[in-house]
Curated annotation (Swiss-Prot):
Gene3D superfamilies (UniProt xref): 2.40.280.10
PROSITE patterns the record matches: SSRP
Protein name stated in the entry: SsrA-binding protein
Organism of origin: Nocardioides sp. (strain ATCC BAA-499 / JS614)
GO biological process entries: trans-translation
GO function term, MF aspect, one: RNA binding
Family assignment from sequence similarity: Belongs to the SmpB family.
Length: 159
């Protein structure tokens, strides 16, 4: 059986991009059980409540929901168990230092398969205040209206 090449997206955490200012991103491998991999291959996962914790020099992914494998038996995994992240030592140290110094948090952004291996994209992020969210929403709305006006103007020129 040949390995699939490229990147196959399983889940995205759109809420994280809305609730946080993303500063740095990292790609980490995941330590998974067999039924978790099979469930992910079915495209089933949720990153919404996920966060990363660094404990005794190891990075752990908490709150990510990978539902039980539908054809699994007694070997099925717990849906919300903590999962170990595979990062280089210097990456873990850098993340831990920045989280402790600047009050940042680490959130998962995307879960995907890359060359047959499950990966998670994590980000160092700073929480947005509610007025930040409203300002970002207003800016997106203004940009959308500008683009639509330009599009209508250009379309009128071609007719």
């Amino acid at each position: 059986m040949a390995k699939e090449q490229g990147r196959k997206l399983i889940a995205q955490n759109k809420k994280a991009r809305h609730d946080y200012h993303i500063e740095d991103t990292y790609e980490a491998g995941l330590v998974l059980q067999g039924t978790e991999v099979k469930s992910l291959r079915q495209g089933r996962a949720s990153l919404v409540d996920g966060f990363v914790d660094i404990d005794r020099g190891e990075a752990w992914l908490h709150g990510v929901h990978i539902p039980e494998y539908s054809q699994g038996t007694w070997t099925n995994h717990a849906a919300r168990r903590k999962r170990k992240l595979l990062l280089n030592r210097d990456e873990i140290d850098k993340i831990e230092r920045r989280v402790n110094e600047k009050g940042l948090t680490v959130v998962p952004l995307a879960l995907y398969f890359k060359d047959g291996r499950a990966k998670v994209e994590i980000a160092l992020a700073k929480g947005k205040k509610s007025w930040d969210k409203r300002a970002a929403l207003a800016e997106r709305q203004a940009n959308r209206e500008t683009e639509q006006a330009v599009g209508r103007r250009l379309k009128g020129m071609h007719d």
